[in-house]
């Protein structure tokens, strides 16, 4: 009887060291603190809330809406604007599928995803439990690219703050589509480029006078500016022609958004773009100018080095290209896409095998001499994969290992960042363990804004992979950073314009100085116009002389050739006429000789004595007719 009762008691799952769990990037099996600390006293908890041992955000976001979170952050900002603490925004996007699984349910507030697997799509009993994952916002399959941009990216560009935007998810879940879109539905990168150049339409400077070099803004001399323009021209010549495609995208974007132009005459804006790829923990420049090679074959790519200097992280030797329009930036983006590494797997026919980071740096120069920098990083992270499901081997297996390793390090960094605010002796964020985290350490350390767009395919066969992705996102949602400081630099000299310094004397008339400066600049403009006209006239006269000399030389050559041809034809005609005359003369002489012989025969006397044998022959005398 006792043995029967013991057998009916369910056994607790015992973790085995012989058959370990599948390694992944999630942190759901790490130990949890038993003691909980109440952060907000004003939030009323429901009596129905139940905390789970294995859920990261099961009840923390179940009854809390996004409006309450925003209200708390606004109150904190009003209390102390210098020490504002905010966390990264984490968005969830569900890919449209034909038969969506019922294991994924979105709450009415559209900020909590409830997962509960009721089929045999997972081998772990813990994964079958109902879990609640909180997000800043959740986009279902009906939400388009316009709403995603307006929610995730548009406000940050209008606020002119540095931001890193990452797309994370499994292979084939729509990460690249969210960033780039297609020919009809533009992604967030084309929309962001169009938004940036519309905002600064009247202030975009046409010459590369400032550049971000090794994390610092540097003034470029004329020869350096000319070199940057040559690099820009070479790369644009290599880019595909997308004029018609850009016009279609522009029409779509203009129809979806009403971007406004900022009117500012005191600021000059320069835009630089760069594109980098992290493949097998090696950093490659996707906008590098290909070297000239004598032999045929693939050109080996150069591995770049990530360097940190005084808190600034940069890639040594990375090509940064100066652009003046959204079309130029989009052409460079397409060029980098063609050079990035793609391969086919059993999950995705065109799977990205590397992490790609497209950066847009905006440098603004104020007439007071202060420059500000705004950087927008768009990171297309490679999809996390399970080797058993993808069936990779060889090179694909090596790529999958490196991808999962870098994503695991990213998860460790996010986990460490989330515990920094909770513990006094927190672990150091291990951003040096991966090239990806080294490049994104500014966002991981809270120096820049961080936004993550998590993409999920709501199907039962991807349930375990989606749980790993959701657990990864829940770690990022718990991070709290202080408000980043806007980067400002001061330059001693600028080539945009020479501003007159304000008089240090008391009572100095600054308006009078500006008027004098305006008059001086107008006179300088007139002088430049006069010099330009004079140079054009001299150049025109020089060209006229060169053209006249060239045409005269051509005419003389043609005349000489014509005279030579006429001489040859005349000589040939003369020879032909002489030959005809000589032949005709010989013929006439022969005829004359023949006639003379006949005359001699007729005048011969012996011919008179010849008597005809015919008696009837007439005996009339022969008459000799003279030609005369």
From Swiss-Prot:
InterPro entries: Kinesin-like_fam, Kinesin_motor_CS, Kinesin_motor_dom, Kinesin_motor_dom_sf, P-loop_NTPase. Residues 509-612 form a coiled coil. Pfam families: Kinesin. Residues 87-479 form the Kinesin motor domain. The modification Phosphoserine is found at residues 607, 612. The modification Phosphothreonine is found at residue 609. ATP binds at residues 169-176. Residues 28-68, 596-628 are annotated as: Disordered. GO terms for cellular component: cytoplasm; kinesin complex; meiotic spindle midzone; microtubule; microtubule associated complex; nucleus; spindle midzone; spindle pole. Gene3D superfamilies: Kinesin motor domain. Its main location: cytoplasm. GO terms for biological process: embryonic cleavage; female meiosis chromosome segregation; gamma-tubulin complex localization; male meiotic nuclear division; meiotic spindle midzone assembly; meiotic spindle organization; metaphase/anaphase transition of mitotic cell cycle; microtubule nucleation. Residues 44-58 have a biased composition (Acidic residues). The keyword Isomerase does not apply. It is found in: Cytoplasm; Cytoplasm, Cytoskeleton. GO terms for molecular function: ATP binding; ATP hydrolysis activity; gamma-tubulin complex binding; microtubule binding; microtubule motor activity. SMART domains: KISc (SM00129). Keywords: ATP-binding, Cell cycle, Cell division, Coiled coil, Cytoplasm, Cytoskeleton, Meiosis, Microtubule, Mitosis, Motor protein, Nucleotide-binding, Phosphoprotein. Disruption phenotype: Mutant female meiotic spindles can be unipolar, multipolar or frayed with no defined poles. PANTHER family: KINESIN-LIKE PROTEIN SUBITO, KINESIN-RELATED. Belongs to the TRAFAC class myosin-kinesin ATPase superfamily. Kinesin family. Required during female meiosis for bipolar spindle formation in the absence of the centrosomes and chromosome homolog segregation. Also has roles in male meiosis and mitotic divisions of the early embryo. This is Kinesin-like protein subito. It comes from Drosophila melanogaster (Fruit fly). The lineage of its organism: Eukaryota, Metazoa, Ecdysozoa, Arthropoda, Hexapoda.
